[in-house]
Design a protein with these regions (language model features):
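Extended aliphatic helical segments
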Residues: 5, 33, 62-65, 71, ...
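Long, charge-rich C-terminal accessory regions
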Residues: 129-235
Length: 291
């Protein structure tokens, strides 16, 4: 945990201080005091790594990204490689990633911590908007790394939206059966032509149908996913509640609202799971993170 910077400093000869000398430099018991720019919180985190927890009763634990950045800057400044490595490991911890993934991504790129950068990129997908306000840490990374983050998000958006547009992934059986197949001509419904269809030996193909409210939900889901490529986007409370309200108001003579509502809730969960799987298939940000 030693710092070569301080190690070399302590070997320098110190001038003898005479009582008659007039100096404004602070001293303690005749020894010069070195002022450090870091605050007590940052130095406390570093010292917690220099002394065993059994002696101090403290373990290295930062409370937020701001504290972690300060420790990284100090560790780099004083050439404390072990402290730097421990601090970089904190970048991959979920609490830190959830707090501000864009800022964590910038720090990970700045300090070439590729694992944390890839994790942070994935966590940014949970943000309804990638950058809601100015992030100073982005100034310290190459524009190419920011471009890769934006490209990754765009690829995830395309992957998620494809599920809202092309419905061939839907299996209209089991718990989802009540959603498809209604043929009540008095209600607004549309044939789902890109759903997996049932083919008969004669070659006739049976297309499935879905009510207009379902298509409205899928269209709105696509709009939300275009800015928020995350499984939770299609579980948005208003989005789901509006669809459930439409189910209750449809008054279909052939469909029981309670069964359709239950099937729809099951569909939403299946939709979200498929989004997670599709996004997981997107090629992650390059591990080398070159500019």
């Amino acid at each position: 945990m030693t710092s070569p910077v301080f190690g070399d400093m302590f070997t320098l000869p110190q001038p003898k201080l005479d009582s008659s000398d007039n100096t404004d430099e602070p001293h303690y018991h005749g020894l010069p005091v070195i002022d450090l720019e870091e605050d007590s919180c940052t130095l406390g985190h570093i010292l917690s790594l220099c002394h065993p927890p059994s002696c101090t009763g403290k373990q290295f634990k930062v409370n937020n990204v701001r504290e972690l950045r300060a420790v990284l800057e100090a560790a780099t400044k004083y050439d404390m490689e072990t402290v730097r490595c421990v601090a970089l490991e904190e970048l991959s911890k979920p609490p830190i990633l959830r707090e501000d993934p864009v800022r964590v991504y910038a720090l990970a790129c700045q300090y070439e911590c590729h694992k944390a950068a890839r994790l942070a990129a994935k966590y940014t997908l949970a943000l309804p908007s990638l950058v809601r306000e100015y992030v100073p840490d982005l100034e310290k990374i190459h524009v190419g790394k920011l471009f890769r983050l934006l490209s990754y998000r765009e690829a995830c958006i395309a992957a998620a939206c494809s599920l809202a547009v092309n419905h061939r992934w839907i299996v209209h059986a089991g718990s989802l059966r009540p959603l498809f197949g209604c043929t009540d001509g008095d209600l607004g419904w549309t044939t789902v032509r890109n759903l997996p269809s049932r083919k008969y030996p004669s070659g006739r193909e049976e297309c499935k149908s879905a009510h207009e409210w379902w298509f409205e939900y899928m269209k709105r889901s696509e709009c939300v996913l275009q800015r928020w490529p995350d499984a939770n986007a299609v579980k948005d409370e208003k989005l789901v509640d509006d669809a459930l309200a439409a189910i209750s108001a449809s008054k279909c003579g052939k469909c029981k609202a309670s069964q359709v509502s239950e099937a729809f809730r099951s569909f939403v969960n299946t939709f979200a799971e498929n989004i997670e799987h599709r996004i997981a298939e997107v090629t992650p940000i390059r591990s080398d993170l070159e500019g």
